[in-house]
């Protein structure tokens, strides 16, 4: 059995508690998601052990098993959509962790059954036992993030086909005009004067816009604030904790807001021979928009960038509705396929509002110094409402 104490993760606790395990325990592998504020993290012990790809360890919080899997990833509208609303263990609050134990191999299955065949991550939350009278704790951290690495695009050629480009209407391909192509097989971007979709008939330089993707993404900010109150005496203890997490993603208009309330109460009776302990955790979380990490035309920003003409500056697309046709027809360099990236992040949103209640109660009777009897009951309940919006004129 390996383990981590609260001090091992207290310096910079991760917004997703699963990420606290990364690089700290032998044989424990954490694969962190990269799809935005709600991104899931996968945990395997001793590598992949299943041919069906399900090698995730079982998470147990104060004796209550919870699943770390994804529930219905996607938007239900397109099979190529991959929308990561977060993994089950994401609800665990890093500030409330007392210790984490890792059980490997047959020992885990022997204790917790077949669900633990891939190992167990056992999380014990904090109580008020270590308090001397009253105690108050305040914690806060802020983390900034930017894209680690962006794809390399060619900038020698721009919109068109067969080395040619001529503006028609962005929607009709007649064989003579190539502005309807969502590809970069046009002429070299040498600054020659051409008409484009938003130049109102005027000729503008045919030049590359190499920083489109960098100018589109923003600096992500994650702020995590926690306040806890605890008390202990010879008859029992209690602890109450409140945590607020606000995350802004690197993709514009993506976020995660999560509020966590956690309490633990203990009581000793009959000269400490009988002990009661109750733990409860409520998590309310939501997002106005979760980014699509898949290859889906209707809501994937990366899909749009792959087809965006290299001579079209991303800032020219900020006004994503055609004048006089707001909320009806998007404004984009081409109308045969592809969607304006700004339309995607502002109108084609994937939102959710979830609440989860996790709790347990146990009673322990100490017969003697070596023998005790324990009764335990636990409950894990979740309610999750999701909404997918797709604007009119969206290509799918």
Which residues does each predicted region cover?
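Short, small/polar-rich motifs associated with maturation and membrane association
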Residues: 1-278, 358-359
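Conserved protein kinase catalytic core
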Residues: 68, 110-111, 285-287, 384
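A surface-exposed, glycine/aromatic-enriched loop/edge motif typical of exported proteins
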Residues: 148-194, 283-331, 388
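Extracellular/periplasm-exposed beta-strand and loop segments of Gram-negative cell-envelope proteins
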Residues: 151, 212-218, 291-293, 333-353, ...
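Short glycine-enriched loops at secondary-structure junctions
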Residues: 233, 328-329, 380-381
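Small-side-chain secondary-structure face that scaffolds active or pore-lining regions
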Residues: 249-262, 273, 281-283, 289-294, ...
